[in-house]
C-alpha cells in the first residue's frame, strides 16, 4: 500500500442520515470508518439545517416520528436533551382560504362557496352518471371519484408541480393509494345529517383514523441531530473527508479490499482503501464510478431525479400562518409549498419582530428555475407571496436560496427494471458493497427508513455475511400521519408497508 493510501475497515460514501447512522453504529462496534462527503461544510444531506444570518432553514421539513423503536432510541441517544414537542398542522391554501389537510370534502365544499360548490357537485354527479371507462391514469381515477372540477382545484395543480409531469401521464394506482378513504358522497350525506341534528360525530367523508397531533423536533432543526452524529463518529476516532466526491472505486482482488479514489473540489485526488464499502451516493453516480464499468451502466444512466429549491424570506410581520407548512393549490404561481420555520421551532427564527418562511419550488437541475440567480428567485418568491395575498412585498427585508439536487428519485415506467438489473449485478460481483438510503437505493425513503437500511448494512458487516436484506425495508405513505411512535420494536415496522409515488404510463403503440 502506498504511504498516501489510508486504510479503514469501512468506507462510507455520503454523510446523510443513512451514512451517518452507519458510521456511528460501526464505530460503536469498534470498526474504523472513513466517511466521504461532497459538501465541504455540512453533514446531513437533505436533512441538514442551513443557517443564514442567524436564521435556520429546514430543507423540505422533517418531522421526527418513527414506528421503529430502534430509530427512536437512536435519536434519543444522539440528542438526549434537545427535542421539543411541536403541534402538527398543515393545510391547503387556495384562493385566500385554508382547507383541511388531509382534505375533508365537506369542509372543502363549505369554504368554496355556494356557486363553486354547486358547480363541483354538478361535476361530481356527472362523473358518477358518465364515468370514465378506461381508468389507467391519475386524472381519470380522481375525476371518477370527485368530478372534474374538484380534481382541477385540489389535485391537478399541486401534483403536477411536485412531479413535473401531467396527471394524465401518472398511473391510477398511485391515486388510489394516496386518496383512499375520502368520499365526497359520504361527506355530503354526513353534512346533511349534521344540519338536521341527526349526526353528532362527523366523519366528513373520511374513514376514522388517528393523526399525529404533535411531533418531536430538534430545537435547532434536523441538522442538530446529524451534527451530533458527526461529533460522536469523531469521538470514536473515525474521520470525515469533507468536500470530496467519489471519483473511482474498484475491488482489488489480490489485496482483498476496495481501492477508492476521491476528488476534492479543486481537482486534487487521493486514495483510500477499505474492506467494505457503503454507498448512499445516487445510484447513477455510484455505477458511473465503479471500475471496471458495470454492464448495468445504461440502466443507471436511465434513472432520473426531481430536484428542489427553497427560497427563505425574512418578513417584517407576525407569522403569516400557524402551520408547519401549507400546500399551494394555485396554478397562477410556481411555488408548491410554504414552510413557516418558527412553527417548527422558535429557535429557527432569532428575531421576534420577523417572520421567516421558506417557499419550496420543485424543478429539474438545469431548468429555468434551477438556473435562476438567487436575486431572481428571491424576487420571484416575494412577488408570489404578494400574489397569494400572504404578505406585502415592502415588508420583505431579506432572503436566501438553498438548492437541493436529486431530492426525489423519479419512479417512471422503467425505473424498477433498471434498479433490479443494477442490484443483481452489483450484489453478485461485490459482496462487500452495500447501497443504503434514499438516493443510494433510488427509493422514496423517509429519513427513518434510510436509517433502517443503514442499520441492516451494519448488521451484515458485524455478522460477517450478507444476512439482512436492505431492500426489504419499504416506504410507508402514511408514516407521519398515523400510529404511535416506537410501536414496532425494529425494522419490521417498515417491512409491511409501501410508499407509492407516481409512475409514468406507457404510451400506446
Model-identified regions with their sequence ranges:
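Conserved Rossmann-like nucleotide-cofactor binding loop
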Residues: 18, 41, 284
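C-terminal lid/capping helical subdomain adjacent to the catalytic/cofactor pocket in oxidative enzymes
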Residues: 413-509
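Active-site/ligand-binding neighborhood in enzyme catalytic cores
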Residues: 119-251, 255-258
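Mid-domain catalytic core of redox enzymes
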Residues: 5, 29, 218, 244-390, ...
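Glycine-rich FAD pyrophosphate-binding loop
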Residues: 27-49
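N-terminal Rossmann-like FAD-binding beta1-loop-alpha1 element of flavoenzymes
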Residues: 8-35
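Flavin (FAD/FMN) cofactor-binding core of flavoprotein oxidoreductases
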Residues: 378-382, 386-427, 433-435, 479
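Dinucleotide-binding Rossmann-like beta1-alpha1 core, especially the glycine-rich loop
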Residues: 53-130
Amino acid at each position: 500500500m502506498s504511504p498516501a493510501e489510508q486504510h479503514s475497515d469501512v468506507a462510507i460514501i455520503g454523510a446523510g442520515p443513512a451514512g451517518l447512522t452507519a458510521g456511528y453504529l460501526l464505530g460503536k462496534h469498534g470498526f474504523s470508518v472513513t466517511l466521504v462527503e461532497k459538501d465541504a461544510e455540512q453533514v446531513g444531506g437533505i436533512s441538514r439545517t442551513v443557517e443564514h444570518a442567524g436564521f435556520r432553514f429546514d430543507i423540505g421539513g422533517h418531522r421526527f416520528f418513527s414506528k421503529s423503536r430502534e430509530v427512536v432510541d437512536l435519536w434519543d441517544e444522539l440528542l438526549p436533551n434537545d427535542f421539543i414537542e411541536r403541534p402538527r398542522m398543515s393545510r391547503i391554501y387556495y384562493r385566500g382560504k385554508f382547507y383541511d389537510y388531509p382534505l375533508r370534502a365537506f369542509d372543502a365544499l363549505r369554504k368554496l362557496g355556494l356557486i363553486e360548490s354547486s358547480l363541483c357537485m354538478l361535476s361530481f354527479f356527472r362523473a358518477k352518471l358518465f364515468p370514465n371507462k378506461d381508468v389507467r391514469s391519475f386524472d381519470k381515477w380522481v375525476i371518477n371519484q370527485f368530478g372534474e372540477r374538484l380534481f382541477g382545484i385540489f389535485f391537478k395543480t399541486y401534483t403536477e408541480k411536485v412531479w413535473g409531469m401531467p396527471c394524465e401521464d401518472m398511473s391510477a394506482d398511485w391515486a388510489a393509494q394516496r386518496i383512499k378513504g375520502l368520499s365526497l358522497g359520504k361527506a355530503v350525506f354526513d353534512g346533511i345529517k349534521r344540519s338536521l341534528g341527526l349526526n353528532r360525530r362527523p366523519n366528513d367523508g373520511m374513514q376514522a383514523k388517528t393523526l399525529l397531533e404533535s411531533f418531536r423536533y430538534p430545537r435547532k432543526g434536523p441538522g442538530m441531530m446529524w451534527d451530533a452524529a458527526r461529533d460522536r463518529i469523531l469521538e470514536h476516532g473515525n474521520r470525515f473527508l469533507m468536500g470530496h466526491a467519489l471519483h473511482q472505486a474498484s475491488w482489488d482482488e489480490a489485496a482483498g479490499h476496495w481501492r477508492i479514489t476521491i476528488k476534492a473540489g479543486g481537482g486534487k485526488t487521493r486514495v483510500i482503501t477499505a474492506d467494505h464499502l457503503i454507498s448512499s451516493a445516487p445510484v447513477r453516480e455510484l455505477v458511473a464510478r465503479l471500475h471496471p464499468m458495470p454492464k448495468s451502466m445504461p440502466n443507471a444512466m436511465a434513472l432520473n431525479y426531481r430536484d428542489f429549491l427553497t427560497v427563505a424570506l425574512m418578513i417584517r410581520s407576525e407569522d403569516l400562518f400557524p402551520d408547519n407548512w401549507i400546500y399551494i393549490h394555485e396554478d397562477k404561481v410556481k411555488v408548491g409549498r410554504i414552510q413557516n420555520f418558527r412553527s417548527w421551532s422558535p429557535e429557527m427564527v432569532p428575531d421576534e419582530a420577523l417572520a421567516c418562511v421558506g417557499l419550496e419550488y420543485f424543478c429539474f437541475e438545469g431548468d429555468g428555475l434551477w438556473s435562476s440567480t438567487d436575486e431572481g428567485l428571491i424576487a420571484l418568491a416575494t412577488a408570489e407571496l404578494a400574489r397569494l395575498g400572504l404578505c406585502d412585498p415592502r415588508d420583505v427585508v431579506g432572503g436566501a436560496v438553498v438548492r437541493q439536487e436529486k431530492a426525489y428519485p423519479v419512479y417512471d415506467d422503467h425505473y424498477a427494471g433498471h434498479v433490479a438489473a443494477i442490484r443483481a449485478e452489483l450484489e453478485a460481483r461485490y459482496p462487500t458493497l452495500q447501497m443504503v438510503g434514499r438516493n443510494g437505493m433510488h427509493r422514496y425513503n423517509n429519513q427513518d427508513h434510510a436509517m433502517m437500511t443503514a442499520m441492516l448494512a451494519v448488521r451484515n458487516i458485524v455478522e460477517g455475511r450478507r444476512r439482512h436484506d436492505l431492500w426489504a425495508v419499504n416506504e410507508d405513505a402514511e408514516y407521519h400521519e398515523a400510529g404511535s411512535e416506537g410501536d414496532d420494536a425494529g425494522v419490521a415496522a417498515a417491512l409491511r408497508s409501501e410508499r407509492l409515488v407516481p409512475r409514468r404510463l406507457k404510451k400506446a403503440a
